[in-house]
Amino acid sequence: MSEIRYALYDDLKEIRNLWEYSFSDEESFVDYYFDKRYNPGCNLIAKETALLASLQRNPYKINISKDSQNTAYVVGISVYPEHRGKKLTTKLLNKALEEAYNLGEKISLLMPIDTAIYRRYGYENCFSLYSFEVNLSDIEYKNNKSVNLERITKMTDELADLLIEIYLEKAKNWDIYLERDRNHYYTYFEEIKVEAGEIFLAKNNANEPIGYMVFYPKMEPSKGYVRELFYLDSSALDSFMTLVASHKTQLDSVTIQQPLDSQLMYYFGFNNKISVSLKPFMMARIVDVKYVLEKLAKDMILDLSIKINDGILSQNNQVFHIKNGSVAISDNKADVVMDIGTLTQLYMGTVSVSSAYDLGKIEAENINLAQLNRLFSYKISYVNEYI
């Protein structure tokens, strides 16, 4: 019988071999990941005499409506083919969610290969990004002499602080985002470099930071990729776009990834030759329902009983009675019924109460829907970390 436990350093070679078997990452990226990011204390494995399956929980801090919470990305879920069909993924994910609850985490994040696989565990798509497909011939050259661009060749504390300053300025417009510190930008820089990307920093004539861009000029043949683009004024955006356009002898087009509050289509004059798509990026799942409902109901005059269906975490599979800001587990008949995935999407502001109800995700009378609607609001989120 397989044992579910945390990895030891002695397991590293087997875990890396399974990663390389399961994923198509370049060797340079795998070296970076296991040298710089990997922590056996965050790696759950299923093992008999040999490794069968693996799952990693990489730690982050998520800020939800000014509430800073510890969380973790579930990544690297992998099972050797001869052991698939033995419910090892289920065992690992169930254990990962139990660990998340015991560690006081309120939300679990998951980077999916196939979203359909993970919805059965209560995860739902909650974070999306805009993807702009732009021909370089449609980018106007706007060289601005008041902007100085610097290609970062080595990360320093000073540079990391400037990037954090820009990120936090943009985050003022987001309701949900992952918090970043110096360590994040050091490891982010190394991740970008092993994938042949560059970070460009823009400063004005007063030497103040006004934006940065993460650009991969060789992501695909004849196509570049802008993974991240932040600007604090239009002159920085002009300079970044001119830099991208200067690659016209190398590239035909570029994919530009942007947050939900992007003004890029406006910048391009709503050019109908530019295609824009909304790409689901990251899944999430509530780990602690009581905590979430207490945050949502704080200072509200409300009387509502909500039944949450959660087939994995029994402490969430309850009727929660909300009354005037307090939340308690109750034997009351529920006014509202929904599953953990629907509650997660409502909490994250991904869907509205009316949309969820119309799609049959919520059971409730109209009078109770009106009360429920007071708890949730649309949120602008930004999550763009891969591992």
Language-model features, listed with the residues they occupy:
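Intrinsically disordered, low-complexity, positively biased terminal segments
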Residues: 2, 8-9, 151-387
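Flexible glycine-/small-residue-enriched beta->alpha junction loops
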Residues: 125-143
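Conserved acetyl-CoA-binding loop-helix of GNAT-fold acetyltransferases
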Residues: 79, 85-98, 234-245
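Conserved beta-strand in the GNAT
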Residues: 50-60, 73, 78, 201, ...
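Short coil/turn motifs at secondary-structure junctions
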Residues: 60-62, 82, 115
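Short amphipathic alpha-helix that is part of the acyltransferase structural core
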Residues: 1-59, 66-73, 140-183, 220-224
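Conserved active-site alpha-helix within GNAT-family acetyltransferase domains
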Residues: 102-106, 112-130, 261-276
